[in-house]
Regions:
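N-terminal leader/targeting and accessory segments in enzymes
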Residues: 1-79, 83, 230, 254-259, ...
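ATP-dependent carboxylate-amine ligase
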Residues: 1-11, 21-27, 33, 37-40, ...
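Short gly/ser/thr-rich secondary-structure transition/capping motifs
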Residues: 5-15, 77-80, 143-146, 165-172, ...
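Short, well-ordered alpha-helix to beta-strand connector turns
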Residues: 12, 25, 50, 64-65, ...
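Short internal beta-strands
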Residues: 51-57, 222-227, 365-366, 389-397
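Acidic, Mg2+-coordinating active-site environments of NTP-dependent enzymes
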Residues: 55-64, 158, 173, 181-336, ...
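Short, active-site-adjacent cap segments at secondary-structure transitions
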Residues: 60-62, 128-131, 171-173, 230-234, ...
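Phosphate-binding loop of NTP-binding sites
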Residues: 76-227, 233-243, 295, 301-304, ...
Length: 481
């Protein structure tokens, strides 16, 4: 502690990082941010009834409130939040999944597998938070440590055995999970994303690696790594001297691996090999990369003491994840998938897989988000141009950027893009794609996945790709007889 003032004997009612959530007696942490700095809201925090404030900067002249300056407010926040909520993480088994792609599918599938044995498990991730007795929409892939500790308290009080977490690179860099010990931590893969935040790929990888090397405050009980990914293989080599390590993949040297894959638009069938035994699996998740996601979840379950080969029926029964290769059925004579793919690697995975299993053409609607990594935009366009026979580039979430500027970045210096149209209105682009699709074709609408809104500057409007597809197809069929 660098200094403190005021009376620190007051009883604290809650721990918050957003002044709008303050109730009388709150302990407010003023955290720096990319868009707003918590230090700018100190007066608001006091006016709303904060009893104490912790800052990372020297602050003077705060009336009638306890204040302290600390060197690392985020790490102090994580420790204070755990203490305030009575260390609920000690009553839970924690699993964390990090990586560019696959976090949502792996964590959701893992929860499904673990609950197959009758236990209740919580879930923290991009789509929803399942807290034991209730489920709420997600507001951040990995929330701030103050929220996380509160969610763990709800899970523990509801009798959950543990929690399955998606752990983002932002969360690791910002110490949101610092000091939480993960019984199992897994790495899926690493490809370009979030360079606008991290600066370069080495910094991005370093953020992910913090979950495994102790910089997060704790080493995981078991590290689970994808050895089909070169970064995962390197992490596995680094993790083995530190503690228990398991690997998965298609590689022959993986501890848990898949062979004899058969893929189509309905899913996958494959053999899982584990400790000298084999079991045939069927999954409704489409694509070889989803086989990797299944392997990751099975290996994490094995790290928790489950027999992964005994989970074949549970994998077959898994209904999938909203907006992750989610199939929309509205009577059309061709498959339509909604997917969250928003990097060039994810698009290549999805489109490349569909090219291999689709008898007709592969069609794609996609866009690039505003106020995010501009460098990946031409690479995303190149991926779609290489693999989709017809494509419509359109608005994703433009946010505060002009769509014209986003389109210019997407075109880059790629030259002519035959078979690709740039259509500003996303609904119109989806309509054109549906009109162009024929029996035998396959359409994937990429980028927004489970999202139900679209962001323009300071405006958020309702927009759900799945619902838009249904509305357009229903309008073309006309009124029911």
């Amino acid at each position: 502690m660098l200094g403190r003032t005021g009376d620190w004997q007051a009883r604290i009612s809650c721990v918050v990082t957003d002044s709008r959530r303050i109730i009388p007696g709150a302990l407010f942490f003023a955290l720096p941010g990319r868009r707003a700095d918590g230090h700018a809201f100190l007066d608001d925090a006091i006016a709303r009834g904060a009893a104490a404030i912790i800052t990372g900067q020297a602050v003077s002249g705060l009336p009638a409130v306890a204040a302290a300056q600390v060197a690392d407010p985020r790490r102090v926040l994580a420790e204070v939040a755990r203490r305030f909520h009575g260390h609920p993480e000690r009553a839970l088994r924690l699993t964390g999944v990090t990586g560019t792609n696959g976090k949502t599918t792996v964590s959701t599938l893992l929860r499904h597998l673990l609950q197959d044995g009758g236990e209740a498990w919580g879930l923290i991730g991009t789509v929803r938070y399942h807290l034991g007795r209730r489920s709420i929409p997600s507001f951040k892939t990995t929330p701030e440590s103050a929220d996380l500790a509160g969610f763990f308290r709800q899970m523990a009080d509801a009798g959950c055995a543990g929690a399955c977490l998606e752990v983002s690179s932002h969360a690791l860099h910002q110490d949101r999970v610092h000091g939480f010990r993960f019984d199992v931590a897994a790495f899926t893969n690493l490809t370009r994303d979030h360079i606008d935040y991290h600066g370069d790929m080495s910094a991005y990888l370093a953020a992910k690696a913090a979950l495994f090397d102790g910089r997060n405050g704790e080493l995981p009980g078991v590290a689970v790594l994808n050895v089909d990914d070169p970064h995962g293989r390197a992490l596995a080599e680094a993790c083995r001297p530190r503690g228990p390590t398991l690997t998965f993949g298609l590689s022959p040297d993986a501890d848990l691996r898949a062979t004899d894959l058969a893929l189509d638009t309905a899913g996958a069938v494959f053999t899982v090999r584990w400790q000298g035994r084999t079991q045939r699996f069927t999954s409704g998740l489409t694509g070889d990369y989803n086989v990797s996601n299944v392997l990751c979840a099975l290996t994490m379950a094995a790290a928790l003491g489950r027999d992964p080969l005994a989970l074949a029926a549970a994998v077959a029964a898994f209904p999938g994840v909203a907006g992750r290769m989610e199939r929309v059925e509205a009577g059309q004579p061709f498959p339509v998938f909604i997917d969250y793919a928003h990097t060039d690697d994810a698009l290549r995975n999805v489109l490349g897989m569909l090219r291999r299993i689709t008898p007709g053409r592969v069609l794609c609607v996609f866009g690039c988000g505003g106020d995010r990594d501009r460098g990946k935009r031409p690479a995303m366009t190149r991926a779609v141009a290489d693999l989709a026979q017809l494509a419509w580039a359109t608005a994703d979430n433009p946010r505060k950027e002009s769509l014209e500027a986003i389109f210019a970045d997407m075109r880059g210096d790629l030259g002519p893009l035959p078979g690709m149209e740039f259509v500003p209105d996303r609904r119109e682009a989806i309509g054109r794609a549906l009109a162009a699709a024929r029996p035998g074709d396959c359409l994937v609408i990429a980028g927004k996945g489970h999202e139900t809104t679209q962001e323009f500057a300071d405006t958020v409007v309702p927009f759900d790709d799945r619902q838009v597809v249904r509305e357009i197809l229903a309008a073309r069929r006309g009124p029911a007889a």
